[in-house]
From Swiss-Prot:
Residues noted as binding Mg(2+) in the record, renumbered to the chain: 253
Annotated protein name in UniProt: Phenylalanine--tRNA ligase alpha subunit
Keyword Protein biosynthesis on entry: yes
GO cellular component: cytoplasm
GO molecular function: ATP binding; magnesium ion binding; phenylalanine-tRNA ligase activity; tRNA binding
Compartments where found: Cytoplasm
Keywords per UniProt: Aminoacyl-tRNA synthetase, ATP-binding, Cytoplasm, Ligase, Magnesium, Metal-binding, Nucleotide-binding, Protein biosynthesis
Family statement: Belongs to the class-II aminoacyl-tRNA synthetase family. Phe-tRNA synthetase alpha subunit type 1 subfamily.
Assigned EC number: 6.1.1.20
Organism annotation: Citrifermentans bemidjiense (strain ATCC BAA-1014 / DSM 16622 / JCM 12645 / Bem)
């Protein structure tokens, strides 16, 4: 029986060495150590041995059982290590690879243009002034020489909250508030949000403006032209053509529309500029004495100029945007281009 047990041990160890999975090891464990296993069958024959043989063979059985249990544990551990190593190799992360960058946002084209305009005028000595978007009739219209019967006061053009409270239609009220707070000299720009009852491919009920004001002794129309020409060359390039056309604004006299050579055709004429070769970008003029009267400035002593432009229009021209509504739709496919 001793030889049989040793042969059983050798056979079990040989088969165990061939096992390549934990399931295979478990099957061999059941085959040799289970209730109906090979070793159990041998142990059942111990009763047929003589009293002298029984303890000797019993010790051999225990030795074989211990060796098998140890062998099964060792082989199972080896297989688990192999499986673990294979999985780690398959799931390995190369720590030398660059990290995955988070998608970064960018500034909106309106913000970009506003900051550029502010920077250009800041270099020319203009401070930034701000005012409320909900404005009084006096600051928005009356102090700017817009009488009660002026068309801009119509409900179709202005959002009213009451008889004298409204959403500002331009940032010019900031100029009035600034002049009422301080004596000359004044040199400010007023960027901000304004509101008008209008909405199409080139207009929005809410849009952005930058208006400027300079008041001091001896300010002339030549100063206005020089500053605006320099501003335009900084914004669109020194080779861009500039012209001023006579116009009318209630709060400036004389007044002018400022055009630049079409950024698409460079003044040759195209569909965008309606074959004229020019694009209007802002309005300007010398401050009307009537405005000075409302803020308590002496129009005989001080002169000055004002100008205003729509930031959306500047952005559309600068970046070649065909439809203003793109600036308000928050489409990432569009915004990621800036």
């Amino acid at each position: 029986m001793k030889d049989k047990l040793e042969a059983l041990l050798d056979q079990a160890l040989s088969e165990l060495a061939q096992a390549s999975t934990e399931e295979g090891v478990q099957e061999l464990r059941v085959k040799y150590l289970g209730k109906k296993g090979e070793l159990t069958s041998v142990m059942k024959g111990l009763g047929a041995l003589t009293p002298e043989e029984r303890p000797v063979i019993g010790q051999v059985v225990n030795t074989v059982k211990s060796k098998l249990e140890e062998a099964f544990e060792v082989r199972g551990g080896e297989i688990r290590e192999v499986v673990k190593s294979a999985r780690l190799s398959a799931e390995r992360i190369d720590v030398t690879l660059p990290g995955r960058r988070r998608p970064l946002g960018s500034k909106h084209p309106i913000t970009l243009v506003t900051e550029e305009i502010t920077s250009i005028f800041g270099a020319l000595g203009f401070a930034v002034a701000e005012g409320p978007e909900i404005e009084l009739d006096f600051y928005n219209f009356e102090a700017l020489n817009l009488p009660k019967d002026h068309p801009a006061r119509d409900m179709q053009d202005t959002f009213y909250f009451g008889e004298s409270v409204l959403l500002r239609t331009h940032t010019s009220p900031v100029q009035i508030r600034t002049m009422l707070k301080q004596p000359p000299p004044v040199r400010i720009i007023a960027p901000g949000t304004v509101y008008r009852c209008d909405s199409d491919a080139t207009h929005s009920p809410m849009f952005h403006q930058v208006e400027g004001l300079m008041v001091d002794k001896g300010i002339t129309f030549g100063d206005l032209k020089g500053i605006l020409t320099l501003f335009i060359s900084q914004l669109f390039g020194s080779d861009i053509g500039v012209r001023l056309r006579p116009s009318f604004f209630p709060f400036t006299e004389p007044s002018a529309e400022v055009d630049i050579a079409c950024v698409i055709c460079r003044g040759k004429g195209c569909r965008v500029c309606k074959e004229t070769g020019w694009l209007e970008i802002l309005g300007a003029g010398m401050v009307d004495p009537e405005v000075y009267r409302h803020v308590g400035y002496d129009s005989e002593l001080y002169t000055g100029f004002a100008f205003g432009m729509g930031i959306e229009r500047i952005a559309m021209l600068k970046y070649g945007i065909a439809d203003m509504r793109l600036l308000f739709e928050n489409d990432l496919r569009f915004l990621k281009q800036f």
